[in-house]
Amino acid sequence: MKLMIFTGLVLFAIVSLIEAQAENEKPCLPEYKVCTHAPGNCCSDLVCDCYGRYKSGAQIGRNCFCLQKGVIYKREN
């Protein structure tokens, strides 16, 4: 009986460890993907950059994208 309980506990620990490891290995977001609701999920060479959207001086929203680190984007006219 003790062996069955011990075996059950060991199996439970192994399954918990596997689930925790799978949780930590989420796929990262590639370049130009939206990261508004997941700012920490961009791939390691990217950063989540956010931009406010304005209409008549009032902010109407916010967009965030995974972009290259250290790159400055400028608006073209």
Swiss-Prot record:
- InterPro entries per UniProt: Spider_toxin_CSTX_knottin
> Which keywords label this protein?
Disulfide bond, Secreted, Signal, Toxin
Per the UniProt entry, the propeptide covers 21-26
Query: Posttranslational modification, per the record?
Result: Contains 4 disulfide bonds.
Protein location: Secreted
Q: What would be one Gene Ontology cellular-component term for the protein? A: extracellular region
Assign the protein's first listed, main location to one coarse class. Answer: secreted
Coiled coil location? none
Signal peptide start and end residues: 1-20
Asked if Lipoprotein is a keyword of the record, the answer is no
| Tissues where the protein occurs | Expressed by the venom gland.
Superkingdom, taxonomy of origin: Eukaryota
List the Gene Ontology MF annotations in alphabetical order. Answer: toxin activity
Q: Which family does it belong to?
A: Belongs to the neurotoxin 19 (CSTX) family. 08 (U8-Lctx) subfamily.
Q: What is this protein called?
A: U8-lycotoxin-Ls1m
